[in-house]
Structures are given as structure tokens and as C-alpha cells.
């Protein structure tokens, strides 16, 4: 009987940990800011992390063929059981995007999948399903959670001020 109970506990812990994968936003390690300056653009971004919340501030400009800022994290998922990304966000009443980059061959090399979402100045919860992502370029890998290379939150494609906060990022 004791062996049966131990097996059941191990089964529950394993099952729950596989289905509750979290990107652990409380630990800022591995998250990084990226701007179009890597390709000659002039957008600027500062990122702060406090009490489990990331704060993105800056500006996106299309000057000099630029136009993006991103908060990005490389991840390594071993199973294909996740259906999307959930998070809480607020900001300056602008549109931001979730970007997902896949492993493997891409044309052009910076191709990604994305979904836009609008923020208000109040915290809102967002759930973005992988099936709702739109392709921005060609990727040889199919959209499966075990093919994800990184996940980013981006200000993209137009001139605007970035004032954005995000927390509780997780895969579901």
C-alpha cells in the first residue's frame, strides 16, 4: 500500500510539473533586451525588473530602416504538450506583439511567428494560442512547443513610445 501511495505521488508531481511549465519571470536571468540597433536602427530600450515584473521603457523608431524593441528569452522545451503563452501586462494604451522564434532553418534568418495584443493602463491577463500566431517569413520547423527557440514581447513596426509592464509569463 505504501509503495502504491509513493508511486501515485511521484506520478502526480511528474504530471503536474510537465503541464505547468513556467518561464519563471521572477528570475530575470536569461531575459534580455534587443533593439534594432543590432542592424543599424535607432530604437532605444531600457529594461528593469522588480518584484517579479519586467518594465520596458523606450521608443521605437522606423528611422534608418529600424522599428523594434524586444524582451526576449531563449527556452528549451523537451515536450510538445503546450498550446500557448499566458501572461499579465499593462502599459501605455499601445499595441505590442508576442514573437515566437523556432529552431532550424528560416528564410530570412530573422523569421518568426507573432500575434498582436493591445494593452491598457490596468493589468489584464492574456492567453495567446500557438495556433493563432501568424508567420512572418519561412520556417522549416512546424509550430510545436518543442520547436520553440525563444519567446519575445516586442514593440514593433511603427514610431511610438514604449511603456510596458509584464509578469506571470507561462506556457499552458
Please give the residue ranges for each predicted region.
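Beta-rich carbohydrate-recognition modules and glycan-binding surfaces
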Residues: 18-172
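Sec-dependent signal peptide recognition
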Residues: 1-13
Amino acid at each position: 500500500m505504501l509503495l502504491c501511495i509513493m508511486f501515485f505521488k511521484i506520478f502526480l508531481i511528474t504530471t503536474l510539473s510537465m503541464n505547468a511549465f513556467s518561464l519563471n519571470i521572477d528570475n530575470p536571468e536569461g531575459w534580455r533586451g534587443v533593439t534594432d540597433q543590432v542592424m543599424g536602427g535607432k530604437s532605444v530600450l531600457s529594461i528593469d525588473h522588480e518584484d517579479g515584473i519586467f518594465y520596458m521603457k523606450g521608443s521605437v523608431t522606423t528611422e534608418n530602416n529600424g522599428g523594434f524593441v524586444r524582451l526576449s528569452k531563449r527556452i528549451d522545451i523537451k515536450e510538445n504538450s503546450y498550446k500557448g503563452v499566458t501572461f499579465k501586462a499593462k502599459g501605455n494604451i499601445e499595441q505590442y506583439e508576442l514573437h515566437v522564434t523556432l529552431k532550424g532553418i528560416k528564410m530570412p534568418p530573422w523569421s518568426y511567428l507573432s500575434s498582436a495584443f493591445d494593452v491598457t493602463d490596468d493589468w489584464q491577463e492574456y492567453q495567446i494560442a500557438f495556433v493563432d500566431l501568424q508567420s512572418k517569413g519561412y520556417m522549416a520547423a512546424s509550430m510545436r512547443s518543442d520547436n520553440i527557440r525563444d519567446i519575445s514581447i516586442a514593440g514593433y513596426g511603427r514610431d511610438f513610445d514604449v511603456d510596458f509592464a509584464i509578469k506571470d509569463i507561462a506556457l499552458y
